[in-house]
Amino acid sequence: MLLRSLDCPLDPLEEQDALFDLAQALNTVGGVTTTRPSFDYVAAERAREYMHSALDRTVTLEELAHHSGRDRWSLSRDFRLLFGTSPYRYLTMRRLDLVRSLLIQGQSLVSAALIAGFTDQSHMTRQFSKTYGLSPARWMKMHRR
């Protein structure tokens, strides 16, 4: 999955999520046993709230850690445990929710992509298609019916 996106630069949060996944995989393969981890719901919720306020800009795991009061690796683990997805994926899904809302309101694809915090329309279209299985333009045609 990580190598599939090398034709375009990685979002910092996406890169950090991939590193976390790699570290977790190495722990598993290396036979590292861990006890059931405790988690910090309040820190994860602070990170989630921060992401909602920052949809229109680049967010890093360091920023999330700063706003949550937790170190970045513990926060990433807590976030996954509590919300069932990585911080990067959560942020992408909220951005796609915003894109759909903006498209329904009549915004162009370019405007919706930029307002929602994607680097460009192409990046948004790739994420939209990967998530929903169809392009934003096709989704709009289906929505208008």
PLM regions and their residue ranges:
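Short, leucine/isoleucine-rich alpha-helical interaction segments at C-terminal helix-coil junctions
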Residues: L22-V29, G106, T131, M142-H143
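Basic/polar phosphate-binding segments, predominantly the helix-turn-helix DNA-binding elements
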Residues: H52, T58-R94, A113-M142
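Short helix-to-turn junction characteristic of helix-turn-helix DNA-binding domains
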Residues: M51-A54, L102-G106
